[in-house]
Every structure is written in C-alpha cells, then in structure tokens.
Amino acid sequence: TDKGKFYFIKTKSKEILAKDLLVKIILNSIGSLSWRKSMKWADKSLLWGRPLRNIFAIFNKKILLFSFGHLKSSNSIIVEQDLITKYKKIISFKEYQIFLKKNNIILDQDERERKILKKFQLICKSKNYRENFNKQLLEEVVNIVENPHVLLVDFNKDYLQIPQEIIISTLQRHQRYFPLFDNK
C-alpha cells in the first residue's frame, strides 16, 4: 500500500467451550474474594466469609463440574429456615428463582434495597421522623439478608446523654441499625 508494507498471519483460534470458560471464571472469582473476617465450616480447612456448605452451578440444564476446597459443584441447593433444612435439585434458573421465592428469599439485591427503602419511607412518614441514611450500611445490609424486614424500636432515653455520634456509630457498626430522628 502507499502507507508501507503490512504483514499478517492467519491462525486458527483455539476452541473453548462456554462451560469450560464459565468454570474457569467461577473458580477465579470465588478464589479471589477476600473477607475482613473468615470462618471455617466443621473440620474443613476452607476459610470463607460465611460457612460454605454447597456450590450450586448449572449451565444449559447441566451441572458445571468443579471443586472448590472440600466442595464439589452440584445441581442441588440448600435452604435453611426456622430450623428446617430443605434440599432441592434444580435444572434451570427459572426453577431456581421459583424455589427461592417460595421460600421467601429475594434473589435480586435491587429488590431487597427497594423493600428496605420503602419501609423506611413509610415509617418516617407515619411517625414524622427524619432519617440520616448511611448508603454504605444500606449496601451491606442489602447483601447480608435474604428477605429484609424493617422494625421500628425505641431504646432507653437515658442513652441520649451519650453523644449522638457515639450512639449512631454503635448502632450502625455493631448492630447494623439505621437511626431515625424525631424533631426534638
């Protein structure tokens, strides 16, 4: 060409199956997660933010086979509620969503956040409270609950002698509470 010589090479791309790529991505992803506090489950050596008992992994209605620590992937999920453990074999994402919904688990984190915010707005409006919302705490709570419920509780007024900043910090950091304020 008038811009000079060009060189090129024709190569055949290595074929990789989507399921193999997914397994690689999943293992890299869960292996790279780090937690401020980790724990073990039973006598296993795997450290994790919460005890891991199961890895549910399916693609195109088939199990994605891999191991992580002492666990092997499967098409079964475990739900524990009210001291009852439920096991269910799942073959599709739709079936997974239905099973979780039947067990009052909200899969969509945006939906969990909307539920929390809506309840807060209702409480604030009905009691004429104002909020001092902590977005970081909201994000944390949204990600540690399966189905959020918002409760309004009072505490002993003697604690109001403690500086407000200490009360708020304690409620948020140690108990994951969201403080609301009246107009006094």
Q: What are these model-predicted stretches?
A:
Residues Q172, F178-K184:
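Function-dense linear segments that define catalytic or interfacial modules
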Residues T1-I168, R176:
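Long, basic N-terminal domains or extensions that often function
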